[in-house]
């Protein structure tokens, strides 16, 4: 695990390896407002093997810091973008357990009301362009929101926010299984 500094750079992932096949898994873990672009790989030796099959299952997650992985990499709950990592959150672990590809639309501190304004964005900071839901069709949609809504909202208000958000997700993903969970034990 490493944090790439600003600008363009080269990074040696491995050297001095024995002959044979080797696997490289690149996990890009960025948080809202941070962009990172992979420009390519340079290999020495025989070259690339055939790419593995793409996942046949697809899951889309909507959530708050629990799914975003905010401060996940810090035992002291340090709040820094370098401490973010959804690879080891419920979203990442669940997707790998099912052999699925996944999209994670999660933001630390997010509420049901706030996600209604974000779920269909291509860019967190811009309302346009809107995300084209035909670009990614999940088999399942998982929503873990609501924990941050408890501050200043009544139980009925929170329930209505769930209904509103579920209506939006159902319209966007008419054929997906939708799973809602939270850690607060609401009915």
Model-predicted segments: where are they?
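Conserved SGNH/GDSL esterase-like catalytic core that processes O-acyl groups on lipids
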Residues: 8, 30-36, 72, 76-159, ...
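Hydrophobic, Leu/Ile/Phe/Ala-enriched alpha-helical segments that form helix-helix packing faces
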Residues: 22, 30, 98, 166-169
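Active-site segments of SGNH/GDSL-like serine hydrolases
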Residues: 142-148, 166-187
């Amino acid at each position: 695990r490493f944090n790439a500094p600003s600008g363009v750079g080269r990074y040696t992932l491995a050297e001095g390896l024995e002959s044979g096949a080797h696997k490289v898994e690149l996990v890009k873990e960025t948080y809202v407002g941070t962009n990172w672009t992979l420009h390519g790989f340079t290999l020495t030796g025989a070259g690339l093997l055939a790419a593995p099959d793409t996942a046949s299952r697809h899951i889309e997650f909507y959530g708050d810091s629990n799914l975003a992985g905010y401060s996940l990499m810090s035992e002291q709950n340090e709040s820094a973008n370098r401490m973010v990592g959804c690879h080891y959150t419920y979203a990442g672990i669940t997707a790998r357990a099912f052999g699925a590809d996944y999209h994670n639309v999660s933001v630390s501190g997010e509420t049901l009301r706030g996600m209604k304004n974000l779920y269909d964005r291509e860019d967190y900071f811009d309302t346009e362009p809107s995300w084209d839901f035909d670009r990614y069709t999940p088999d399942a949609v998982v929503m873990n929101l609501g924990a941050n809504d408890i501050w200043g909202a009544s139980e009925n208000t929170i329930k209505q926010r769930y209904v509103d958000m579920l209506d939006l997700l159902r319209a966007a993903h008419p054929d997906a299984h939708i799973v809602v969970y939270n850690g607060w034990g609401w009915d």
